[in-house]
Amino acid sequence: RLTKWKGKVASLSPSLGQLVATVSPIALGRALLIDANRALVAATWGGAGLLVTVGSASAACVETPDGVFVCSVPETTTQSLSATGTLLDVTIDPGASFTTTAGNALDLTGNAGITFLNNNTDATITGDLSGIEALNTGSGALSITTKSTTTGSSVYGINATNSGSSLSINAAGTTGNSVGINAYNSGSGALTIITTGTTAANTSIFSTGIEANNNGTDLTITTSGSTRGGAGIVATNDGSGDLSITT
């Protein structure tokens, strides 16, 4: 029998003594933790039975169904989100934010396309290394849209690499140490970058506000805010289409 307090399992009755005797504590503990997110379990084993207390905290990003993540609470550790054989679809809800003192804020990895959507201006993204690292190694498009500030304290604000079809980035204020926005598209489609705020890197001669390399079709960069760094914009189009920069 399960006893609940405030909707959470608090104890199991002594009638589970026979079960306790026939399975290992590790196996039973794992079974009890199914679907528990970051559960903290304290178990006392004795002749009277089993006492289990569970305290859990919601993860910033929850996956349901496969490949679909919704991030809704503040997080201070790297969120590594991935999908294999299906689109990686990440949505940032109001109330979420990401601030890490080690690593990247968000690591996005897929082989069938990636879509990242943050329509919330207060859902800031700050990583000790990079703000957003996105890598699509297979088919499909890579798309990043964020209306909040994105900061990479040591490396990139946004770093996106695509091997599928098109790569598109639509970003508000973005700051990196070496590069504000770094985009590389080896896919078959276009590379498009749109910025609506300041895009900046540090002022060393080796830094770049926006760096874009395309091997697909068109390369288009449109900025409505300032773009700063040792170099403002560095764009290389080795694809079959046009190169267009509008500031």
Regions found by a protein language model. Name each.
Residues 78-84, 103-111, 130-136, 156-162, ...:
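Glycine-rich beta-solenoid repeat tracts in large extracellular/virion proteins
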Residues 43, 49-55:
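Terminal targeting and flexible regions in eukaryotic proteins, enriched
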Residues 5-9, 38, 120, 163, ...:
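N-terminal cationic leader/targeting segments used for protein routing and processing
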Residues 65, 69-77, 81-103, 118-129, ...:
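Beta-strand-rich solenoid/repeat architectures in extracellular/passenger domains
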Residues 38, 53-60:
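Sec/Tat signal peptide C-region and signal peptidase I cleavage site
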Residues 1-46:
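Bacterial Sec-dependent N-terminal signal peptides
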